[in-house]
Amino acid sequence: MIAYLDTSAFVKLIVDEDGANDARSWFEEAGPAISSVITYPEACAALSRRAREPGRRGARVEAWIEALDARWSRVLAVQVTAQPAGMLALRHGLRGMDAVQLGSAIRTRERLREQGAQAQLLFASFDRRLLEAAEREGFATLGGPLE
């Protein structure tokens, strides 16, 4: 299995919350795990925000970032060009960074096909709108509409 993880799936690798066990399983089973270069800074922002949430006393963002770094070192990070992502935002009504995530996955799928890869690229997310857009773009998806 080759899995593309967006930021919502990647954060669940670090934080114990609904969907975390699924995300961790996908990450461990993926060979390789792939994500956009924007996932790292987005994940840092999300982890910082979660550490400030009520009920998260004792959450140490530094420990989460260390865990993020350990996992990020195992990710193939991909770039995307701006215009295709912009067209995806228009086509699917996506937020800008979600369009970049989907564009990165599409570019990855194209490269895998060019290289003759037989494995299917699965798109993992916990964002309902992004999952629906990925399905319309022909991806099999992993995740759930939790956000």
Give a label for each model feature:
Residues 1, 30-33, 70-73, 118-122:
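Short active-site oxyanion
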Residues 1-39, 50-63, 139, 145-147:
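Short, well-structured N-terminal submotif of metal-dependent ribonuclease cores
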Residues 2, 40, 106-147:
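Acidic, PIN/NYN-like endoribonuclease modules and their adjacent C-terminal/linker elements
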Residues 8, 44, 48, 86-89:
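Amphipathic alpha-helical segments within well-ordered protein domains
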Residues 10, 39, 81, 101, ...:
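Alpha-helix capping/helix-boundary segments
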Residues 12, 45-51, 106-110:
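Short glycine/serine- and small hydrophobic-enriched flexible loop segments
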Residues 34-35, 96-99, 125:
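Short beta-strand scaffold positions
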Residues 70-92, 99-108:
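Acidic catalytic patch
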